[in-house]
């Protein structure tokens, strides 16, 4: 329906939009040096299941019949940002942390993943946050590498993003993404805070102050 609305709007004079269905880690169909501005909001590594957010629409359209169908239809294609996206039996944490994409932040990510792996032992759910964090930043590093290829020089990228603290362990998402962008070939980054998070509700799971805003990357 949204697609057809966009097609209809193209009959009006003005700039035209092209809708591509592609993986941000590959950007198939986008020419090299195509863009000089990218504005997007990637998944936040805060254990929100973006696949589950599509369940109502996909059920209505007949694309899924039960909750388990989301794994085959959606989850396996997502950047891991939820513990349900990573299976302890199928992810080799050591191999992920050793991947070349993580070299700019390997020590910091390894330390955080180690703390998460230790904390989960004392938690009932034993959620695989340590695997989620490692896989998330490896995949986001791949996104930055592809963005560098499809962006002109100079260009500007804006990520609306927020940090995270699974099990109360702080994950500095903004500087880590910024460092990955620099490693991919961009020149500089800055952050513009929009709001504070995890400060409103008294029944929140942890007391770590979080923020959300715009990560600006130039180069």
What residue ranges belong to the model's regions?
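SAM-dependent nucleic-acid methyltransferase catalytic core
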Residues: 1-40, 45-52, 107, 111-114, ...
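Glycine-rich, phosphate-binding/catalytic loops in enzymes
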Residues: 36, 54-59, 175-177
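SAM-dependent methyltransferase catalytic-core segment centered on the flexible catalytic loop
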Residues: 45-146
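Acceptor-substrate binding/catalytic loop of class I
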Residues: 127-138, 161, 165-175
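Helix-to-beta-strand junctions that scaffold the AdoMet/dcAdoMet cofactor pocket
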Residues: 151-153
């Amino acid at each position: 329906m949204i697609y057809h609305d966009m097609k209809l709007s193209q009959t009006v004079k003005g700039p035209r939009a092209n809708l591509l269905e592609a993986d941000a880690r590959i950007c198939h169909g986008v020419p090299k040096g195509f863009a000089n501005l990218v504005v997007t909001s990637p998944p936040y590594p805060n254990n929100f299941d973006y696949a589950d957010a599509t369940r109502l629409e996909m059920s209505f359209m007949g694309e899924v019949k039960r909750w388990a169908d989301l794994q085959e239809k959606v989850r396996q294609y997502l950047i891991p940002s939820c513990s349900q996206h990573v299976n302890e039996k199928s992810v080799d944490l050591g191999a992920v942390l050793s991947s070349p994409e993580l070299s700019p932040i390997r020590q910091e990510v390894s330390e955080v993943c180690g703390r998460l792996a230790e904390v989960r032992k004392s938690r009932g759910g034993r959620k695989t946050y340590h695997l989620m964090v490692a896989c998330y930043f490896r995949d986001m590093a791949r996104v930055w590498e592809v963005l560098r290829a499809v962006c002109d020089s100079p260009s500007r990228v804006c990520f609306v993003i927020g940090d995270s603290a699974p099990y109360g362990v702080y994950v500095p998402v903004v500087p880590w993404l910024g460092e990955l962008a620099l490693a991919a070939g961009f020149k500089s980054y800055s952050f513009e805070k929009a709001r504070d998070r995890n400060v409103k509700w008294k029944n929140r799971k942890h007391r770590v102050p979080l923020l959300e805003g715009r990560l600006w990357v130039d180069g």
